[in-house]
């Protein structure tokens, strides 16, 4: 077989902190059964490098994401004032409070997908408290965020205002 079609990422690494002993045991059984805890040497090296030398990159990354959050917040205030950005406290996911649009969740989803041509997380998938909300991932290049906001503003001007 052609090696390029059999790509396997060798630098995947993750951590699971599970304080509940019963849940931790069940997790361990699952991981062992699937041989999912078999680390690769490059994964270990990349984790070590990230923890040892990643501070500058992380600081730059967080500043960039904060800039995207600021951009979305200011853009919506100016171009789609009935949609409010809720600034995240510890992530790159911005909740969009769309309740002032007074749309059903179905109509809200149709507005974002069919009119703005955006695929965001439907707030209702997180429970009834999420009704009237959409969730936007801003851990993207600024040009992608700008394009998404322009699409949203264009749809807002045509269908909401």
Regions found by a protein language model. Give the residues of each.
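Short beta-strand-to-turn element immediately C-terminal to the catalytic PLP-Schiff-base lysine
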Residues: 14-21
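PLP-dependent enzyme catalytic core of the Aspartate aminotransferase-like
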Residues: 104, 111-120, 126-161
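Glycine/threonine-rich helix-loop capping motifs at alpha-helix boundaries
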Residues: 25, 31-40, 84, 159
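Conserved glycine-rich beta-strand-loop-beta hairpin in the small C-terminal domain of fold type I
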Residues: 41-44, 48, 64-73, 85-98, ...
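Structural signature of PLP-dependent enzymes
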Residues: 25-33, 50-73, 105
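Alpha-helical elements of Rossmann-like donor-binding domains used by nucleotide-donor carbohydrate transfer enzymes
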Residues: 13, 45-49, 64, 71, ...
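Short, small-residue-biased leader/transition segments that mark boundaries at the very start
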Residues: 2-9
């Amino acid at each position: 077989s052609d090696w390029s079609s059999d790509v396997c990422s060798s630098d995947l690494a993750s951590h699971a902190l599970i304080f509940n002993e019963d849940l931790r045991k069940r997790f361990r059984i699952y991981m062992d059964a699937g041989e999912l805890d078999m680390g690769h040497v490059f994964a270990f090296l990349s984790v070590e490098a990230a923890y040892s030398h990643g501070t500058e990159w992380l600081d730059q990354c967080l500043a960039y994401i904060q800039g995207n959050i600021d951009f979305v917040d200011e853009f919506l205030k100016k171009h789609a004032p009935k949609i409010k950005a809720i600034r995240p406290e510890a992530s790159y996911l911005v909740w969009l409070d769309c309740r002032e649009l007074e749309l059903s969740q179905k109509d809200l989803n149709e507005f974002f997908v069919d009119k703005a041509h955006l695929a965001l997380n439907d707030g209702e998938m997180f429970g009834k408290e999420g009704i009237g909300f959409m969730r936007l991932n801003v851990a993207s290049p600024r040009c992608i965020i700008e394009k998404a906001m322009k699409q949203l503003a264009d749809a807002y001007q045509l269908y909401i205002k």
